[in-house]
Amino acid sequence: MKEFLNKIYYSFCKFEEFFFPYGRKGGYSSVVMIEMLASYQFGIASAFSAVTSLVFLTFFRRPFDYYFLIPILTAIIGFCILDYYTKKKVWKEPNEEIIALYKEKGIDAINWFTIGIFVWLLSKLCITGGIILLILCFDRI
C-alpha cells in the first residue's frame, strides 16, 4: 500500500513540475491532493457530506428536490477545510529518493496520475450516491 501511495505521490509531483516549472510561489500544491486521498482530510470531507445531508433532511420536507446542491455544498465546505489546512501546513518538497527510484524504473507518471484522479472521483461518487439513497429512503417514510 505504501509503495502504491508513493507512486501516486510521485505522479502528482511530476504533474506539478509540468504545470508549475518555476516552483511554488504560494498557493496550492498537487501534493495536497494525494494527501487528501491518503489521510484524514478525506474522512473530514466524508463527514461533512453526511452532515450536509442531515441538514437537508432536517430543514426541507422534500429534500429530494434539492439533492443536486449536496455535492456543491460538500465541495465548498471541503475546499474551505483544505484551504485552512494548506495554509497552516509547512510545505515539504517532493522526496528526491522516491523521484530518483521511479525515474530508474521508468514508471509512467501519467498512468498513476489518472488512477489517482479516478479513485478520488469514484470515492466522491460513492459518497454522493449514498447520501442520495439516504434522502430517498427518508423521503418515502
Each PLM stretch: what is its role?
Residues 125-141:
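Juxtamembrane boundary at the C-terminal end of a transmembrane helix
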Residues 19-26, 88-103:
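Cytoplasmic membrane-interface regions of multi-pass membrane proteins
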Residues 21-64:
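Short linear elements at protein peripheries
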Residues 73, 77-78, 90-99, 121-127:
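Long protein-protein interaction modules used by eukaryotic assembly/scaffold proteins
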Residues 23-41, 103-127:
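Loop-to-transmembrane boundary segments
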Residues 60-89:
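Hydrophobic alpha-helical membrane-embedded segments
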Residues 1-29:
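Membrane-proximal soluble regions of multi-pass membrane proteins
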Residues 2-5, 9, 13, 78-95:
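Membrane-water interface of transmembrane alpha-helices
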